[in-house]
């Protein structure tokens, strides 16, 4: 399971280096294979270990091609999906269309989300964090059934 936010850089070829603490689990459990796609609700990328992506793909296969929203979701997630493997230095190339979608240039944030990672432009990540903080402050957590008993 992946957690934590790491500041990373894109090199001139559009590659990122996955932080060392994630490399061994990715290699041992997933043979260093990932699938990168877009987040349909935010301007970031989603990086799934291959076994986790297979679960997502199975759910996508159940969506209807005759329902416009379901078809659009399939089109976005599958159309942008790119399989990759970490090289010996833990690097992976981000295809240009994916970099453009997430406005990635030089500085990025890799954010663990248990079964996957999010990859954000650093400035967009900072903005998202502030928006999330304000949304949580303005929410009546007790009114949300799943959050009513949530305690840290």
UniProtKB/Swiss-Prot annotation:
Identify the domain of life. Answer: Bacteria
Task: Give the Gene3D superfamilies listed for this entry.
Answer: Transcriptional regulator MraZ domain (3.40.1550.20)
State any GO CC term.
Answer: cytoplasm
The segment(s) forming the SpoVT-AbrB domain are: 5-52, 81-124
Subcellular location(s) per record: Cytoplasm, Nucleoid
Q: Name one GO biological process term.
A: negative regulation of DNA-templated transcription initiation
| Xref: Pfam families | MraZ (PF02381)
Q: Name one GO molecular function term.
A: transcription cis-regulatory region binding
| Keyword vocabulary terms for this entry | Cytoplasm, DNA-binding, Repeat, Transcription, Transcription regulation
Matching NCBIfam families: division/cell wall cluster transcriptional repressor MraZ
Q: How does it assemble?
A: Forms oligomers.
What's this protein's family per the entry?
Belongs to the MraZ family.
- What is the official name of this protein in its record? Transcriptional regulator MraZ
Its lineage opens with:
Bacteria, Pseudomonadati, Pseudomonadota, Gammaproteobacteria, Alteromonadales
């Amino acid at each position: 399971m992946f957690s934590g936010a790491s500041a990373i850089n894109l090199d001139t070829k559009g590659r990122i280096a996955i932080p060392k603490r994630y490399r061994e689990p990715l290699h041992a459990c997933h043979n260093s294979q990932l699938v990168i796609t877009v987040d349909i609700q935010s301007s970031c990328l989603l990086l799934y270990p291959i076994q986790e992506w297979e679960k997502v793909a199975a759910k996508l296969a159940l969506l209807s091609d005759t329902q416009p929203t379901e078809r659009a979701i399939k089109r976005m997630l599958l159309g942008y999906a790119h399989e990759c493997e970490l090289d010996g230095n833990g690097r992976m190339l981000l295809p240009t269309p994916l970099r453009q979608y997430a406005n990635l240039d030089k500085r990025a944030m890799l954010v663990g989300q248990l079964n996957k990672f999010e990859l954000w432009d650093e400035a967009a990540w900072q903005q998202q964090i502030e928006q999330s903080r304000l949304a949580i402050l303005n929410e009546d957590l007790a009114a949300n059934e799943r959050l009513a008993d949530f305690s840290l």
